[in-house]
Curated annotation (Swiss-Prot):
InterPro entries: ATPase_E_C (IPR038495), ATPase_V1_Esu (IPR002842). This is A-type ATP synthase subunit E. Has multiple subunits with at least A(3), B(3), C, D, E, F, H, I and proteolipid K(x). It is a peripheral membrane protein. It comes from Thermofilum pendens (strain DSM 2475 / Hrk 5). Keywords: ATP synthesis, Cell membrane, Hydrogen ion transport, Ion transport, Membrane, Transport. The gene is atpE.
Amino acid sequence: MRGVAEEKTLLEVIIQELRRAAEEESRRIVKEAEQEAQKIVEEAIQKAEAIKAEKLNQLLNEYRQKAMAELAPKRLELRHRAIREKHELIESALNRAIEEAVKTILGNDDYRRTFLEKSLEKGVVALSSTDLVVHPCRGSASIVGQVVEAVAARLSKVKPGLRLEIGDPLGCTEGVVIVSRDGREIYNATLEAKIAEVRESVKPKVLELVSRARA
């Protein structure tokens, strides 16, 4: 009987040991499964976040490109408007300055005579012909005779044989138009021509100064 009892006890021990080993293996498998599941979940979350971030970046890039595409014409329009307004302001300032200068010249007989003499002398020197007809503007008609004589005397050594004849008056404001006798040469020495010359010469310089000041 004792031997049977000992065998039973040994069997129980073996069963318990097997059960314990099975439980440990089961717990290990469950733990590994839980860890694997946790790992899968974490990887899934990371992938989802990566996809979400990538999608978000893609959307941001798309919106940014769309915004840039929509803003580009507006920026160009604003730039053109700014340039146009700058030119208009400069043009207005030039006009005011020129108007003041013209008023000063026309309001003073000495200035008118000086302008006429310098313009006539410059034109006579610029033309190759020595036989010239001087057509005065309406504002210079009353003094052109004296000025022509003075300029002819002053330039007689520079252009031997110089002959200046006063022609019919023109509708311009001040100054003269000089034409060679054969009609092949002409020189516009009017106040209007001088204004245009000054405007074309000064405007680029003013634009450059304004651009430098804003830079």
